[in-house]
Amino acid sequence: MDRVSLFHGYLPIEPADRMRRLKELEARVYSENQTQLFIETPYRNHKMLEDILKTCRPQTKLCIAANITCEGEFIQTKTVKEWKGKLPELNKIPCIFLIYK
């Protein structure tokens, strides 16, 4: 099966709704071989990252692409487990988050 990438824009702001949506997106990663892309308002990036790390499986891959095409560009992929405890500073910079297997 070919890999498909889907862009979802902003996820819900309410924590319970956001975590439920993250679980749905991660399920599609594994059941449909899809990469899920989404963004967050820059001042909420850290909260989004925390929620991803709390919600997603340890083996799920998370790519964080921040400040793309700008000075200080940051693009890195690790598993959820590898990201825990080693969070980049993402406050007030545009980011795209991708989850996949």
Q: What are these language model-derived features?
A:
Residues 1-28:
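Class I SAM-dependent methyltransferase SAM-binding "motif I" and its flanking Rossmann-like core
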